[in-house]
A protein has these predicted regions:
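A short Gly-Trp-Pro
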Residues: 1-8, 14-178
Length: 178
């Protein structure tokens, strides 16, 4: 993958750049991602978020290696609850999901749909498959983890150490709780 990857929402008004290699490329099968994915893809003009088995593809990057180059004022956040520790950020202009951010997290889980198929990083693992009604439908092309693995957490820790234990803030104008 290129060291600088230009990404954009469907209409091009919000543009981001991801620099360097991703921390990991995962498909999340957790209940929250499936619920949020269904909500996001039901919005007007929104692209499909969920895969055929309810999974959401994320390309995880360090926050300090993702820049919002245009359209910052168009960012909107969706939270599944007012007390939720995560938010999904989308481009308000066209309802393209951009990233999932955890409160206090040092990384962004960028939605895989932002990459053209031809250059999208390959999936390395599926997480939280225990939340699926029937995990046996998943292909066995990558590890299907019941939760998350030590390797997954080790990658996150390595990135956080490299960042000097910082967790940059990303301001988003609109915040919606559902």
């Amino acid at each position: 993958m290129a060291s600088h990857q230009s990404l954009a929402c469907a209409c091009g008004q919000v543009r981001l750049t991801a620099t360097g290699q991703p921390i990991a490329t995962v498909e999340c099968c957790c209940d929250s991602c499936r619920k949020a994915g269904a909500m996001l893809q039901s919005m007007p003009q929104a692209p499909d978020v969920l895969g055929p088995h309810g999974q959401t593809l994320f390309v995880m990057h360090r926050k300090d290696r993702v820049s919002i180059d245009a359209g910052h004022s168009r960012l909107r956040a969706l939270r599944l609850s007012s007390r939720g520790g995560s938010r999904r950020v989308l481009a308000g202009c066209c309802n393209t999901p951009l990233f999932l951010e955890f409160s206090g997290g040092h990384w962004l889980s960028l939605y895989g749909l932002l990459w053209p198929d031809s250059i999208r990083p390959a999936v390395e693992m599926r997480t939280m498959v225990s939340d699926l009604p029937d995990a046996s439908v998943l292909p066995d092309d990558v590890p299907n983890l019941k939760t998350r693995s030590l390797r997954f957490y080790a990658r996150l820790m390595k990135a956080w150490i490299a960042m000097g234990f910082r967790s940059p803030r990303i301001e988003v104008a609109g915040d919606t709780h559902v």
